[in-house]
């Protein structure tokens, strides 16, 4: 049975990512002026906005008069540093990302074969879409709150601090600085959360394929050996493909998760430090925005850890699915085939971030612990 749209959860988001210069266009390999424009478009868009804006934020942090003033900018500067890593990674591996997306969507080896599999796949896609649309809209809401909250302050203040090369604390010039802040931050925010979504989706999709393998193994529970043996061979071949996809996924998501984990502890630390020195009574709008920002940051680091953990869990669960087959009724030759498969399953499936750690829930807990340790140290130093 022909499958439905296998990438339905992110189909719209893929189009948006091409329009904001994150992914290559589908027909970018053709010749012509339009193709050339498509190739330089990401740089034309992100150089004056994303990279210039991030450079101005870091300049503001470095030239701050004291540590407390720098802390007001550093929490966002480090966040955008993680974005730079994600951007450079997806641009450097743009062909690998496009190839993986195309294979997940069009390779007939991954076609769904019956109504039960289609129902399972569609439900899974809807669940992922629901989670990440909440995450995307929640993140954008935090940014919008930041843009608006400054209008409730007595003094002129920017939503997210950066170095402005002219005097902007006047009625005539304030909205120039504020407008650039809004446009650049919106692009940064959207790029950040969509790259998060793409990385998590790759892990989610491969975890779903491992679950599909488990379903097909368990469907052989009452199957005769004549039917089960060729089906087992097809399952083994599909498993080999999914293992290869896992390695390709690791290459794409490893730098992004590594940068996110490394920087998140500092981001949460400086955000908490900013809250301590800000106070709710003095700046209620910015205080609430910063609290929301911390909540989004915690979700941002939790999601890749969760989906990496899901991938590993469902890959390892295939051992139990093998025992769900009708193996006791099989011949010696088929049992030996299953035994070889069991030996193959002993090789653990793990997605690693660099060479340092496995992507999973334990690293999320460790990141939160590190953030608290850094925060306690920062408070002690600042006294």
Swiss-Prot record:
Source organism, top-level taxon: Eukaryota
The cellular location(s) given in this protein's UniProt record come to: Cell membrane
Q: Does NADP count among this protein's keywords?
A: no
One Pfam family assigned to this protein is 7tm_6
Q: Which UniProt keywords apply?
A: Cell membrane, Membrane, Olfaction, Receptor, Sensory transduction, Transducer, Transmembrane, Transmembrane helix
> What InterPro entries does the entry give?
7tm6_olfct_rcpt
Question: Membrane-spanning regions, if any?
Answer: 42-62, 71-91, 131-151, 175-195, 251-271, 285-305, 359-379
Give the Cytoplasmic compartment stretches of this protein: 1-41, 92-130, 196-250, 306-358
- Write out the GO MF terms: ionotropic olfactory receptor activity; ligand-gated calcium channel activity; odorant binding; olfactory receptor activity
Q: Name one GO cellular component term.
A: dendrite membrane
List the Extracellular topological domains: 63-70, 152-174, 272-284, 380-383
Please give the biological process terms from Gene Ontology that the record holds.
calcium ion transmembrane transport; detection of chemical stimulus involved in sensory perception of smell
Per the record, membrane topology reads: Multi-pass membrane protein
Miscellaneous comment in the UniProt entry for this protein: The atypical heteromeric and topological design of the odorant receptors appears to be an insect-specific solution for odor recognition, making the OR/Orco complex an attractive target for the development of highly selective insect repellents to disrupt olfactory-mediated host-seeking behaviors of insect disease vectors. Odor-evoked OR currents are independent of known G-protein-coupled second messenger pathways.
Subunit structure of this chain's protein: Interacts with Orco. Complexes exist early in the endomembrane system in olfactory sensory neurons (OSNs), coupling these complexes to the conserved ciliary trafficking pathway.
Q: What does this protein do?
A: Odorant receptor which mediates acceptance or avoidance behavior, depending on its substrates. The odorant receptor repertoire encodes a large collection of odor stimuli that vary widely in identity, intensity, and duration. May form a complex with Orco to form odorant-sensing units, providing sensitive and prolonged odorant signaling and calcium permeability.
By sequence similarity, the record places it as follows: Belongs to the insect chemoreceptor superfamily. Heteromeric odorant receptor channel (TC 1.A.69) family. Or2a subfamily.
Q: Mind telling me what this protein is named?
A: Odorant receptor 94b
Which species does the entry assign this protein to?
Drosophila melanogaster (Fruit fly)
């Amino acid at each position: 049975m022909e499958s439905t749209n296998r990438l339905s959860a992110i189909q719209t988001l893929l189009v948006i990512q091409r329009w904001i210069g994150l992914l290559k266009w589908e027909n970018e390999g053709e010749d012509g002026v339009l193709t050339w424009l498509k190739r330089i478009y990401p740089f034309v868009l992100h150089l004056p906005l994303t990279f210039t804006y991030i450079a101005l934020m870091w300049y503001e942090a470095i030239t701050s008069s004291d540590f407390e003033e720098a802390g007001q900018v550093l929490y966002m500067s480090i966040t955008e540093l993680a974005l730079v890593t994600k951007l450079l990674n997806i641009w450097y591996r743009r062909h690998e990302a496009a190839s993986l997306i195309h294979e997940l969507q069009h390779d007939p080896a991954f076609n769904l074969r019956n109504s039960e599999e289609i129902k399972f796949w569609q439900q899974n896609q809807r669940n992922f879409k629901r989670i990440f649309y909440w995450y995307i809209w929640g993140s954008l809401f935090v940014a919008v709150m930041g843009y608006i909250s400054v209008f409730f302050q007595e003094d002129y203040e920017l939503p997210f601090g950066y170095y402005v090369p002219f005097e902007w604390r006047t009625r005539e010039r304030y909205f120039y600085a504020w407008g650039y802040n809004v446009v650049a931050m919106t692009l940064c925010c959207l790029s950040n959360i969509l790259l998060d979504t793409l990385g998590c989706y790759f892990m989610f999709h491969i975890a779903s394929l491992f679950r599909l393998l488990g379903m097909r193994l368990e469907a052989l529970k009452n199957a005769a050996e004549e039917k089960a043996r060729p089906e087992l061979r097809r399952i083994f071949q599909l498993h080999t493909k999914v293992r290869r996809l896992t390695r390709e996924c690791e290459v794409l998501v490893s730098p992004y998760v590594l940068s996110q984990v490394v920087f998140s502890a500092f981001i949460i630390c400086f955000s908490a430090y900013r809250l301590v020195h800000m106070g709710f009574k003095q700046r209620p709008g910015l205080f609430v925005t910063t609290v929301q920002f911390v909540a989004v940051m915690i979700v941002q680091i939790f999601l890749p850890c969760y989906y990496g953990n899901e991938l590993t869990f469902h890959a390892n669960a295939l051992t139990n699915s093998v025992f769900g087959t009708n193996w006791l009724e099989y011949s010696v030759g088929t049992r030996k085939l299953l035994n070889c498969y069991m030996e193959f399953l002993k090789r653990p499936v793990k997605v690693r971030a660099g060479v340092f750690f496995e992507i999973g829930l334990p690293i999320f807990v460790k990141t939160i612990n590190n953030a608290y340790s850094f925060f306690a140290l920062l408070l002690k130093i600042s006294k």
